[in-house]
Amino acid sequence: MKLVQDKITIITGGTRGIGFAAAKLFIENGAKVSIFGETQEEVDTALAQLKELYPEEEVLGFAPDLTSRDAVMAAVGTVAQKYGRLDVMINNAGITMNSVFSRVSEEDFKNIMDINVNGVFNGAWSAYQCMKDAKQGVIINTASVTGIYGSLSGIGYPTSKAGVIGLTHGLGREIIRKNIRVVGVAPGVVDTDMTKGLPPEILEDYLKTLPMKRMLKPEEIANVYLFLASDLASGITATTISVDGAYRP
């Protein structure tokens, strides 16, 4: 059984890491997938990789400025107009920052909040415009275990992800009357480019504290997205699912 057969799906941050793993998994399960990336070059590279893996499937790609509601709405609207609807929006794009409170700059803090919180808000807002009349849809937001427990390695990232969790829970309660579900996923330490970009000493400390003695694979997070986007999760909304291997920052 293909869990998301013919579901029109957009994945931000879909060119690598968790987002790219989700794109592959959703295609394999019958979805019509569009990916958003940071640059058009990055998007084109990912599209070429997906075309090689799934030559019979059409995948669309865009590189909107996620901090601009108009830019995100234009890209989301293009997808919805082409297929006649939007079923699943996965707001997965984000950046990290590892400055502690006493050293974080105002500019860096504003930047991570703009991308990680405003970017998710803009994606959710745009998706809602395409889902509200049909009274159906699922919005999935990537949070983080650090948004629940905080982190000693930095203040900006966990603050932004706590914002994503608050947005998810509040929006989920507000728009369930339109039969639109909103769910967060809070990964632990995942083996992605973002994690590999951490300072070696921080990554080493992370690995020492992992109860599973390994980082999670992007596919393990994508599996949860697939379930949440499917009709099997029809009763789940306004909550955040932790996929953290018992890790606590």
UniProtKB/Swiss-Prot annotation:
Keywords: Lipid metabolism, NAD, Oxidoreductase, Steroid metabolism. Disulfide bonds: none annotated. The active site is at residues 157, 161. Induction: Induced by the C24 primary bile acids cholic acid (CA) and chenodeoxycholic acid (CDCA). Gene3D superfamilies: NAD(P)-binding Rossmann-like Domain. Pathway: Lipid metabolism; bile acid biosynthesis. GO terms for molecular function: 3alpha-hydroxy bile acid-CoA-ester 3-dehydrogenase activity; bile acid binding; NAD+ binding; steroid dehydrogenase activity, acting on the CH-OH group of donors, NAD or NADP as acceptor. Substrate binds at residue 144. Pfam families: adh_short (PF00106). InterPro entries: NAD(P)-bd_dom_sf, Sc_DH/Rdtase_CS, SDR, SDR_fam. One of its GO terms (biological process) is response to bile acid. The direction of reaction is pH dependent in vitro. At pH 7.3, clearly the reduction reaction is preferred with an order of magnitude higher velocity than the oxidation reaction. At pH 8.7, the velocities of the oxidation and reduction reaction are comparable. At pH 9.9 the velocity of the reduction reaction is about 60% of oxidation reaction. It catalyses: a 3alpha-hydroxy bile acid CoA + NAD(+) = a 3-oxo bile acid CoA + NADH + H(+); choloyl-CoA + NAD(+) = 7alpha,12alpha-dihydroxy-3-oxochol-24-oyl-CoA + NADH + H(+); chenodeoxycholoyl-CoA + NAD(+) = 7alpha-hydroxy-3-oxochol-24-oyl-CoA + NADH + H(+); deoxycholoyl-CoA + NAD(+) = 12alpha-hydroxy-3-oxocholan-24-oyl-CoA + NADH + H(+). Its EC number is 1.1.1.395. NAD(+) binds at residues 15-18, 38, 42, 92, 161, 190-192. It is an enzyme of class 1 (oxidoreductase). Involved in the multi-step bile acid 7alpha-dehydroxylation pathway that transforms primary bile acids to secondary bile acids in the human gut. Catalyzes the oxidation of C3-hydroxyl group of CoA conjugated bile acids generating a C3-oxo bile acid intermediate. Can use choloyl-CoA, chenodeoxycholoyl-CoA, deoxycholoyl-CoA, and lithocholoyl-CoA as substrates with similar efficiency. Highly prefers NAD over NADP as cosubstrate. Also catalyzes the reverse reactions; in vitro, the preferred direction of reaction depends on the pH. There are three genes for BaiA proteins: baiA1 is identical to baiA3 and encodes a polypeptide sharing 92% identity with baiA2 gene product. Reaction mechanism seems to proceed via a nicotinamide-OH(-) adduct, which is proposed to be involved in proton relay instead of hydride transfer. Belongs to the short-chain dehydrogenases/reductases (SDR) family. Homotetramer. This is 3alpha-hydroxy bile acid-CoA-ester 3-dehydrogenase 1/3. It comes from Clostridium scindens (strain JCM 10418 / VPI 12708).
